[in-house]
C-alpha cells in the first residue's frame, strides 16, 4: 500500500496532485490507480507482468490472490473460463476497430456513427483497466455469481454494475473484476459505492470523454499501429 502526506501533514484522500499528476487515494489514504474514460493509464505506471496461463498475463501484484481465487472456485466444483487479463494498446485498438467495422456492416452506419456505437461497449485505447494487468474477465454461468460473492475476500471488486453506469461510464459487466487489495475491497464491499465514488472521482460521461479526446476518437490509425508487445 502507498500512502501520501500533504504539506500540511494530513494524509491524502481522494484526488490529489503530486508532481503535476493526479493520484487517487481511498478515504483511508491508500493509493489506488484509477483508469476510466477520463483517466487514461498514468505515464508513470508500468505493469510487472507474469504469465497466468497460455497467453494470458496479469500484474504480479494480483497474481497470488487471483490464483487462490480461481483455485477455490474450482475446488467448489464450479467451472469458469478465464477470458481476458492484461491487454496491450494494440489489442484494445483492434477490439475497437473490429466493433466499429461490425456496426458499420450490421447497422449500415457511417464510420463516425459506428465508432460512437462501438464506444458504448469498448473502452478508448489507453483507458481500459486491462492495460493495468489488474483487471480480469471471468466467465461461467455458475462462476460469475460465485466470483461476485467471493471476489472481495481476495482483494478484487466487481467493477461495473448497471446501477453505476452513469458514474463509471461503462455498461453492466458482471464478468469484470479489478484487483485493489483486501484493505480496499473489504472496505468497499458493503459500501454500495463504485470505485469512482469511493475515490472521489468525477463521473464519466460520453460527453466528457469526447471533450477529452476530440477527433482522436475518429482517427482509424491513431492508436494501434505500434507493434504488439
Positions of predicted regions on the chain:
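Extracellular adhesion/carbohydrate-binding repeat motifs centered on closely spaced tryptophans
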Residues: 1-31, 64, 149
Amino acid at each position: 500500500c502507498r500512502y501520501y502526506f500533504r504539506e500540511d501533514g494530513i494524509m491524502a484522500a481522494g484526488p490529489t496532485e503530486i508532481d503535476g499528476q493526479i493520484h487517487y487515494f481511498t478515504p483511508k489514504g491508500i493509493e489506488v490507480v484509477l483508469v476510466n474514460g477520463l483517466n487514461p493509464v498514468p505515464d508513470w505506471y508500468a505493469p510487472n507482468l507474469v504469465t497466468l496461463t497460455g497467453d494470458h498475463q496479469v500484474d504480479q501484484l494480483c497474481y497470488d490472490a487471483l490464483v487462490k481465487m480461481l483455485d477455490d472456485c474450482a475446488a467448489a466444483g464450479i467451472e469458469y473460463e478465464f477470458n481476458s487479463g492484461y491487454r496491450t494498446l494494440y489489442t484494445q485498438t483492434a477490439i475497437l476497430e473490429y466493433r466499429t467495422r461490425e456496426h458499420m456492416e450490421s447497422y449500415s452506419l457511417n464510420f463516425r456513427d459506428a465508432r460512437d456505437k462501438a464506444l458504448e461497449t469498448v473502452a478508448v485505447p489507453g483507458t481500459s483497466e486491462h492495460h493495468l494487468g489488474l483487471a480480469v474477465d471471468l466467465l461461467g454461468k455458475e462462476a460469475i455469481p460465485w466470483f461476485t460473492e467471493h471476489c472481495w475476500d481476495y482483494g478484487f471488486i466487481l467493477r461495473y454494475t448497471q446501477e453505476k453506469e452513469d458514474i463509471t461510464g461503462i455498461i453492466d459487466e458482471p464478468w469484470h473484476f479489478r484487483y485493489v487489495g483486501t484493505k480496499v475491497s473489504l472496505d468497499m464491499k458493503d459500501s454500495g459505492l463504485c470505485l469512482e465514488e469511493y475515490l472521489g472521482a468525477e463521473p464519466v460521461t460520453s460527453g466528457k470523454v469526447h471533450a477529452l479526446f476530440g477527433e482522436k476518437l475518429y482517427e482509424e490509425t491513431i492508436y494501434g499501429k505500434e507493434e504488439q508487445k
